[in-house]
């Protein structure tokens, strides 16, 4: 049965919580040399866990175009193929064009696309503002690039650090110009300031004017 047959027609479906899976070196491709050399190591290096190595190697091989049969199996059975559970191996997990196609298959009109946990583990906790804001810029560019396959339907979520209100305002302006459609904020206090602190009011005014929402994950 065609996978889209189960979806009713004349209905708008919006996926409000999707993520990408970041492969090794994903962020480094967008970062300056300074940021690259000062990124923290991932708190979980998935690709070097012995049990997961075969999955990642298979995924890399497929994404390089060396296993079209596997790609077709994943695509033709988007919901049922066991490969969908295997992080990077899933169809559309790391490739924007595959993600766009997966929306068509699933009958989804649009999708908010979050990063994984790369920002928490690589730069957001750095004591160096250059790394925090440079890392944020790199990740935001990577997210916009992923969603460029169909930026009308794939809505990129960037990260907005709140370490320094003035730098955060410039970071928000830059990311909006890039094409970031929403910002993920940390819900806890940063430098003793909650997100509701008046020092951030110019940022909220900018986002309101641009029509760019913020999202929070309480407790993280």
Predicted regions and their residues:
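Helix-coil boundary/capping segments in enzymes
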Residues: 1-220
């Amino acid at each position: 049965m065609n996978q889209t047959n189960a979806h009713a027609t004349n209905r708008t479906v919006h996926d409000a919580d999707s993520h990408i899976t970041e492969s090794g070196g994903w962020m480094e491709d967008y970062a300056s040399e300074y940021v690259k050399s000062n990124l923290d190591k991932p708190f979980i290096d998935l690709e070097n866990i012995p049990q997961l190595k075969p999955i990642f190697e298979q995924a890399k091989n497929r994404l390089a175009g060396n296993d079209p049969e596997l790609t077709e199996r994943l695509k033709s059975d988007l919901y049922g193929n066991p490969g969908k559970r295997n992080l990077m191996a899933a169809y559309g997990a790391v490739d924007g064009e595959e993600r766009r196609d997966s929306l068509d298959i699933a009958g989804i009109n649009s999708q908010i696309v979050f990063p994984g946990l790369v920002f928490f583990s690589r730069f957001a906790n750095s004591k160096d503002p250059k790394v925090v804001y440079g890392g944020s810029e790199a990740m935001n560019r990577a997210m916009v690039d992923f969603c460029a396959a169909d930026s009308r339907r794939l809505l990129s979520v960037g990260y907005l650090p709140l370490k320094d209100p003035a730098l955060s305002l410039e970071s928000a302006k830059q990311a909006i110009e890039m094409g970031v459609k929403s910002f993920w904020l940390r819900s806890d206090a940063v430098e003793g300031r909650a997100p509701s602190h008046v020092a951030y009011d110019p940022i909220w005014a900018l986002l309101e004017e641009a029509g760019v929402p913020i999202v929070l994950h309480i407790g993280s």
